[in-house]
Amino acid sequence: MDIIIKNGTIVTADGISRADLGIKDGKITQIGGALGPAERTIDAAGRYVFPGGIDVHTHVETVSFNTQSADTFATATVAAACGGTTTIVDFCQQDRGHSLAEAVAKWDGMAGGKSAIDYGYHIIVLDPTDSVIEELEVLPDLGITSFKVFMAYRGMNMIDDVTLLKTLDKAVKTGSLVMVHAENGDAADYLRDKFVAEGKTAPIYHALSRPPRVEAEATARALALAEIVNAPIYIVHVTCEESLEEVMRAKSRGVRALAETCTHYLYLTKEDLERPDFEGAKYVFTPPARAKKDHDVLWNALRNGVFETVSSDHCSWLFKGHKDRGRNDFRAIPNGAPGVEERLMMVYQGVNEGRISLTQFVELVATRPAKVFGMFPQKGTIAVGSDADIVLWDPEAEMVIEQTAMHNAMDYSSYEGHKVKGVPKTVLLRGKVIVDEGSYVGEPTDGKFLKRRKYKQ
């Protein structure tokens, strides 16, 4: 064996057990029994042994609002590793007037040899010409089996219903999964412009211009269009009861409706956008944070198996230099917030509070995203033959989240001041220790591109 992990409590989505495990050549080769000698033995007494976290919603080196986000693959993936995440699926964004192949080549240049953990891509389709829709057919051969479209941001990303239908139809034929940002873009734009015309330019009006019904209407429409062409569909970042009801209604009538929520929708509210000294701009993301009552609704849905995962939607817009561009007009504030490092710790608080079980935690942050996005059982579980992506978790360790302790390129944390109990201590990527007792010890060449399998239609 290369490594033996002994005395830990193994937690998977299927159960909890006490067993030692052996690792060789990057794979888990034995669980329990006599393991024999190893080059290194790690004592995991008092710790949970989790599969590495999988974050299927990140925007690492993104360009939007005429500016470049702060993180690189090097900084964002080190942050992810230190938070217990060993795989991300990042959004590879097509440039208008360019092919999808050019987008993939661009992302390969940014991520290749510069990622601390394993990574894959979803494709964001910004310019859905007929030739681009046809080009979607070749993506699964590259291991890219999901793509995203937007029902919001007219003039930037927004597509019409016919294009969404074409995209869904193409996905069925190619074994891919369409991910949809569901907001009624015209309604949001109308309210945004109306508020600004009335002199209402503070960050809070970002939330007020995108009320829950703006999200719910588009969610219902996207699900109906998927139903029309009998396609699976994945609704990203569900935030509120109104949208959740649409997802559940669709499921009840047999639509293959999948959905995620994100960490910030479990903890932040629209009142955070009213923080003084323009601090509210830190919490401008889309869809916006909702009411506190929605936290309970979302946690209940997580417990009841409605959601596939909790993602971070990590997007690294600095407070100084990015967000402050919108001091006089909330429409100029780049939308998005960091969270790839904090994700597992924040979701784990749901275990401490009795909102979800320990096995549900693993299901939501690792196993289910691996299954949905074509990585299981290579990723997302602890089993013989799986990649040795492992997190040793101290359930008793406590910390207060502060940006000074994070590893990204940001100047704030969305969860600044939150006290958490339960933190990752040691992280292995394919059998290599990349975080050792809280310290990053890996290399930027550790991560590899992950070719994902087709979605099971």
UniProtKB/Swiss-Prot annotation:
Record organism: Ralstonia pickettii
Alphabetical list of NCBIfam families matching this protein: D-hydantoinase (TIGR02033)
GO cellular component: cytosol
Modified residues (N6-carboxylysine): 148
Protein name: D-hydantoinase
Positions annotated to bind substrate: 153, 286, 335
Cofactor annotation comment: Binds 2 Zn(2+) ions per subunit.
Function, in words: Catalyzes the stereospecific hydrolysis of the cyclic amide bond of D-hydantoin derivatives.
Homology family: Belongs to the metallo-dependent hydrolases superfamily. Hydantoinase/dihydropyrimidinase family.
Keywords: Hydrolase, Metal-binding, Phosphoprotein, Zinc
One Pfam family this sequence matches: Urease_alpha
Catalytic EC class: hydrolase
Residues annotated to bind Zn(2+) 2: 148, 181, 237
Modification Phosphoserine occurs at: 69
Keyword check for Transcription: no
Record PANTHER family: COLLAPSIN RESPONSE MEDIATOR PROTEIN, HYDRANTOINASE/DIHYDROPYRIMIDINASE FAMILY MEMBER
Top-level division of the source organism's lineage: Bacteria
Protein residues bound to Zn(2+) 1: 57, 59, 148, 313
Keyword Hydrolase: yes
Residues forming coiled coils: none
Modification after translation: Carboxylation allows a single lysine to coordinate two zinc ions.
